[in-house]
């Protein structure tokens, strides 16, 4: 139980948080105003001074508690916020207030944990998306099975509110949050559909992102427990622990009982080589042991979602495959473990032996087809990868056009420099280079060949291929053999905290 005291102390401290009064503090909406969210929703009147108004917020909250608020005519959506009801304005204003207020206790918890020097030093590097890949390079080559898991959604909004109540004890705040979610997200249905979630995420992105991350955090909170104590649980009885009330007490009791007499016997059912990585709406679970334990985890996840989150999860949402026979997509890369076989000749006295050695190697590949589809959607090429001009940018200056294309190439090179094979990346850069030339030729109403011959832009456009070498030469020695070796090897950057806009996981 040495891993758990921090969580238990944090759980006790959260019981004293009171968030409801913060909704009536002007500085909360000042924070939302200063974060460049849609500022027009905070203006009391366009003809007066441009200041956010707490009076509007108080009137909106009061209106939400009124019974006649549920009956809305079709013409009310265009009324002034003082004389009538405006659904979009109400939703955005209160959503921003909820998002900022509900984040406060969790931000305080994060800042207090980062005050420790060791955590703060490692936190900066761990924020990077690329920090996942060196970890996988070290671990995946020793593992045998992988489970692709799609995290189920949408979760019912009432379940979200109930889960949040276990972490923050403030009854009035959650009454208002429940009213808000039902009035603006789930008014006419008892079932939360993907369409309603999509609409809510677009109109209230900050609050939606918090609720979704909180749902994933809660599910991983149980996963940590299952990871450490799954060998103690009989499958037909373990679901009783998913009741969130007194969860920590039940967990402590379980450890005390089973750690005394069964520690040696239960090691046969433990899986010490299991690794878990979550990204976007998916996660992967890898293990070295037999498929039996992976199937055990599959049933754990399905029952967790069904018993605790009331989500009907299909078994096909979790696919278990041998790692050497299966490739999976992770944060814009294709990953697969390749078997390298080599024969070694060994001679002992007059006898010669041939020994076959099998080494597993992780291949991290740029997904060329999804990237070409993304470039085609952005109008840089057609669906088969032939570069086309970008007429929308033709009104800009030559320098701005070239600079835009260079930024895209720079970002792609920065993101995909960890690839095992760079040919796909060079093809993407080639498409962008020709698209840039065609855009410039379109602007000057000329053919590509005539434009290059007249303007002499070939040297300038070589930056698409030379900029990466210049950056690497500043970091590493200028020896040509060193640079060639770096082009063949993978380079991970620990300053990437956002995925590229052209990266889409299928």
From Swiss-Prot:
Superkingdom in the source lineage: Eukaryota
UniProt similarity note: Belongs to the intron maturase 2 family. MatK subfamily.
Compartments (UniProt record): Plastid, Chloroplast
InterPro entries attached to this UniProt entry: Domain_X (IPR024937), Maturase_MatK (IPR002866), Maturase_MatK_N (IPR024942)
Pfam families per UniProt: Intron_maturas2 (PF01348), MatK_N (PF01824)
PANTHER family linked to this entry: MATURASE K
GO molecular function: RNA binding
Gene: matK
Transmembrane segments: none
A Gene Ontology BP annotation from the UniProt entry: RNA splicing
Protein name (Swiss-Prot/TrEMBL): Maturase K
Entry function: Usually encoded in the trnK tRNA gene intron. Probably assists in splicing its own and other chloroplast group II introns.
Keywords per UniProt: Chloroplast, mRNA processing, Plastid, RNA-binding, tRNA processing
GO CC field: chloroplast
